[in-house]
Amino acid sequence: MEVVHAGEMPWGESLVAQRGGGTAVAHKRLFEGTEDSPDHYLLVMAREPNTYFSPRHRHPWDQVRFCLEGSIPIAKGVFVDGGEIAYFPESTHYGPQEGGEDRIVLLLQFGGASGQGFIGPDRMKQARLEMAKHGRFEDGVYKQDVVEGRRNRDAYEAIWLHVKGDVPTYAAPVYKTPVVMLPAALPWKVSHEANVSTREIGVFPHRGLSITSYRLAPGGSHVFPADTALRLLFVTAGTGHIEKHALGHWSSVRVNPGELATLHTDSGLEWMQLTVLPVAPEQA
């Protein structure tokens, strides 16, 4: 079990330089999994300006975006506003992304049900630098000056081809569009656990993903039993402790599969929790 305090971390370099955006795009790397695993994941905080552009595209993995501030464009006239959460399923098209407001976003990327995993930021940067010797990245597209063969390709697809030696395989999409959720529209429901209330925001069983908000009353405790799932917590209000670690606004917690932990608050605490089960063996 680990804790990081995103609000206190400095902004790092852009992890999506292949999409452009310059130095105005920045990221904070919170937690990540194991490269080449079908369960590989990356949790980051992202800062994007309203000038950021990404063409219509899709991924062979899954993504969740929690808009903390501003507004995220995900298609023409479609936005994820502050406090809203969007799920981008594997193989589902979205975009173009342009306009909206400057925003700060909590972003989780993780291997989809197809078991292909995803390429982590370090390997992606290495590939991008290697590919820059033979072409250029512009507006989310990799362009090559070649006599024969395909000249232009989606930036991420081009990197995937460079790293893995083949283009990504897209499973039949389970959803036509990304799913945008409005947590504030849901009532808090009293849990069977004393002093705990929840909002069950979204459950996506084909990938074992659940998105839930928790509210812990002053003086309350919450136990995370040992489980096969990965649990990622993001504190949205209040203060508390998980084991010996202090929690505050924008603290993030990783409870790994098999770990048990207890969270306690004296003054009250709210957090958003992403729970992800391992990719099923028959899928991987």
Where are these regions (language model features)?
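Jelly-roll (double-stranded beta-helix
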Residues: M1-A284
